[in-house]
């Protein structure tokens, strides 16, 4: 686990209610972890996701692919690493989740996002400015 390879990292801890009957994190919660980390990335850049919506700008997930490697369990501390790139009208987020206790890769995600401004699909140039240091 080399967290220096990511433009942003965010640490979290698994809560009991995020686990299923098998005692591991329910697969849907990995999407929540990734979404929260993307919002934290924006926040670290001085951008509030809710305020974007109020201003008529909505970043939306168009496609998500998640590869599950090993499960997280209740109480596990983990880190989400993020990289991103622009591909045409989409911003693609590459998000990896590592368990902090041993540095093992738990999940790899690719999240393709689009931008809708005032109800119309756009290229989302505002995100070029927001992510200018990373694109």
Features from the language model and the residues they span:
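Residues in well-ordered beta-strands of folded domains
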Residues: 13, 67, 112-114
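Hot-dog-fold acyl-thioester-processing enzymes
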Residues: 2-60, 116-135
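HotDog/MaoC-like acyl-thioester-processing domains
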Residues: 3-4, 9, 73-74, 84-135
């Amino acid at each position: 686990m080399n967290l220096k390879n990511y433009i942003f990292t965010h640490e979290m801890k698994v809560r009991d209610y995020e686990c299923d009957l098998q005692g591991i994190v329910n697969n849907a919660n990995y999407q929540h972890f990734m979404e929260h980390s993307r919002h934290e990335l924006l926040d670290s850049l001085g951008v509030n996701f809710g305020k974007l919506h109020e201003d008529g700008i909505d970043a939306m997930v168009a496609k998500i692919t998640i590869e599950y490697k090993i499960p997280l369990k209740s109480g596990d501390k983990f880190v989400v690493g993020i990289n991103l790139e622009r591909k045409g009208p989409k911003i693609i987020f590459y998000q990896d989740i590592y368990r902090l206790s041993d540095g093992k890769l738990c999940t790899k995600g690719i999240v393709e996002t689009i931008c809708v401004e005032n109800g119309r699909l756009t290229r989302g140039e505002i995100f070029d400015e927001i992510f200018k240091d990373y694109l």
